[in-house]
């Protein structure tokens, strides 16, 4: 079970001030359970782990196997919540050098539709020219510009290279049940498709086919991922006392820190494989809480790498920050520091020690230094990098996010602000229906 330690926040806030949130947290939990809070149309994630059927998982696994059998490369086309959850899990569990391994046990997973970089898309299409590839197109509407543009390119290339019949076999849609361009295309072309539930927003969708299908294609155990999430669903339930509920304590602590002037939360990891977990977390909390002119700004760093870039600012910059450190208790491999007769680097004092022991001491030393420098620290410990533990971590953050948003007084399940850039972009591109906006924006240029 993952654990949360908030002791290194005391001195900046008190244990009593965190405990004082108990009644507010209970009200937030009840609002989530009863569907009486803001954004109550998007609570399908709340009990998703415990409600996923074995039949549904079997269908996902079977489809994943078709892609695995027929593709050496699979492109996940999506943006934001439509790809970050899957990528977070896949990157956390994959060999760091899987690209370079001659014998691969699963298709190479590549991501598209998350940017509009012409060079990126050109280089991707060039790379795919001699590859047996498939596509998982993830979009509820099918009209999100970045993803729709990438899919248009990939669909044509797949059909041209592999033929219409094989393309039909290796293109899978994850989209709305009834409406939208992606649904129409899937039905017209005869693609296998999975449904994005209407009551689950993108950033909470990692345990729907949005995340589960790509994760299964990559060769990971989605049943164990779901089981881990279900375990945490129970541990963070509304019936669990405040003092024993990690999601409740995390939500309360970060809100109390925010109330005391800590406006920026930095998610820290000392494991490079967790980089995309941080990226997923940034979207989860940024879109959920950044509204109504308030909200904690979610930032992330990879230590010890970023200690050599951001470490100075964190140690001695403006004291508006707090850190939440994700620590992995047990690594998957063993590597000892060798002895060297010349000892020119002066590292023989580490000879015989595990590399992970050095990393753990860097973690502890950094935490103490940052606390001494005025940065409150929370610490989340996950037992290992496994499907079960990652499933626990994802649900922990989701549940805490729902509670935290209600404590903040915002709707954690909408994102009205993301439409502003789209409106301007469509006006600048002269999209039909945006004529008036186009005139107005041209006058500003």
From Swiss-Prot:
Location(s) in or outside the cell: Cytoplasm
Top class in the EC scheme: isomerase
InterPro entries registered for this protein in UniProt: G6P_Isomerase (IPR001672), Phosphoglucose_isomerase_CS (IPR018189), SIS_dom_sf (IPR046348), SIS_PGI_1 (IPR035476), SIS_PGI_2 (IPR035482)
Reaction equation(s) it catalyzes: alpha-D-glucose 6-phosphate = beta-D-fructose 6-phosphate
Enzyme Commission code(s) on record: 5.3.1.9
One of the record's GO cellular component terms: cytosol
GO biological process: gluconeogenesis; glucose 6-phosphate metabolic process; glycolytic process
One Pfam family hit: PGI
UniProt keyword terms in alphabetical order: Cytoplasm, Gluconeogenesis, Glycolysis, Isomerase
Its job: Catalyzes the reversible isomerization of glucose-6-phosphate to fructose-6-phosphate.
Name by which UniProt lists this protein: Glucose-6-phosphate isomerase
Native organism: Bacteroides fragilis (strain ATCC 25285 / DSM 2151 / CCUG 4856 / JCM 11019 / LMG 10263 / NCTC 9343 / Onslow / VPI 2553 / EN-2)
The gene coding this protein: pgi
